[in-house]
Amino acid sequence: MAEYKLLKTEGRAKRAEFHTVHGTIQTPVFMNVGTIGAIKGAVSTMDLQQIGTQVELSNTYHLHVRPGDKIVKQLGGLHKFMVWDKPILTDSGGFQVFSLAKLRKIKEEGVYFNSHIDGHKIFMGPEESMQIQSNLGSTIAMAFDECAPALAERPYVEASVARTTRWLERCKKEMNRLNSLEDTVNKNQMLFGINQGAIYADIRIDHAKRISELDLDGYAVGGLAVGETHEEMYYILDETVPYLPRKKPTYLMGVGTPANILEGVDRGIDFFDCVYPSRNGRHGHVYTNQGKINLFNQKYEKDMRPIEEGCQCPACRRYSRAYIRHLLKAKEMLGMRLCVLHNLYFYNTMMEEIRDALDAGNFRSYKEEKLYNMGQIDREKEMSGQKKFY
């Protein structure tokens, strides 16, 4: 069922369509993050439809511990559970296992750790992650991997990447088995492998070559935006992405800001996800084409303009900065909800603009104009070769 159709290119940037059992994804795309099956900020799947969301992302670990993946399967899978008929990507739970668990023990078979909810002991390995994601019935499942710290010592990273490769082979074998079962929720579930290697470009390149041989449905670059600088992240993408299959979707995990996304697209990335738009929105920080603003600032107390003039999101079509600020100050849920809706709409609309620019063959000029308007680059410094990344 999966088919990746490359429509246009500009440098390394790609404009494509990814056909899945739950619909066609136009890329580049930003996936809206609903960790536990919902976007934080009282955002419904009906809202997601209205603001142009193409793909929702949920988390394997969190849905496993609550309400339980077996319960979700009994209820018909995550799509029916959420009332969402478009693509869903589930990440493997690996990042949460390695970042949330204070007590964990890594072995070849997998990881032992304690639940963040009640402390009970949990084991998760490649097979368990695939089984949970199969129960959820997501469109795209992510391979179980270890996300090594960005500044980890080289010997540790080498051992970690080798183990991640072995785990990926086990993930592929288990997914093939699960997709063949009669009672599987989604027999067309796809598997994306994850490139790791911290900030060691040669390890990343070697790993990219190895996992590319497995002929998976797509590939992700993981383990970035976890402590390294933006310059280091872009360097790793420059070095690594060319060694991943160009005719398969490429996903940059957990990234990021609007500037990060523009730079990622320029380096050949198709899929992005990040909690920034919802997290920032819940704290009154909203995105505009002139940069991010904090609605808690007193200067917006009597500002009757929408968050952004011309924006067609549910917040901007009806409400003023002053009113939304009042709601936020009063800790009224509606204020947070409106900010989250605006930010997600901003991201989704920016991705549509990126796709339009690639279709028209002017992505580079769009990117530079967007970064300049948002205050992310100084054109004089850029011309002199002193460009700074944000």
Regions found by a protein language model. Give the residues of each.
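Structural signal for hydrophobic packing residues in well-ordered secondary-structure cores
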Residues: 137, 168, 172-175, 179, ...
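A non-catalytic, amphipathic alpha-helix used as a structural packing/dimerization or gating element
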Residues: 128, 132, 136, 159-170, ...
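Glycine-rich phosphate/ribose-binding loops and adjacent secondary-structure elements
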Residues: 162-165, 174, 178, 186, ...
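Short, solvent-exposed loop/turn segments at secondary-structure junctions
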Residues: 32, 62-64, 95-96, 148-149, ...
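Non-catalytic, usually N-terminal nucleic-acid engagement modules in DNA/RNA processing proteins
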Residues: 1-184, 298-301
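Glycine- and acidic
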Residues: 149-154, 158, 218-224, 333-336
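C-terminal extensions of enzymes
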Residues: 1-19, 25-31, 41-42, 145-151, ...
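Conserved, mostly hydrophobic/aromatic
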Residues: 23, 56, 91, 133, ...
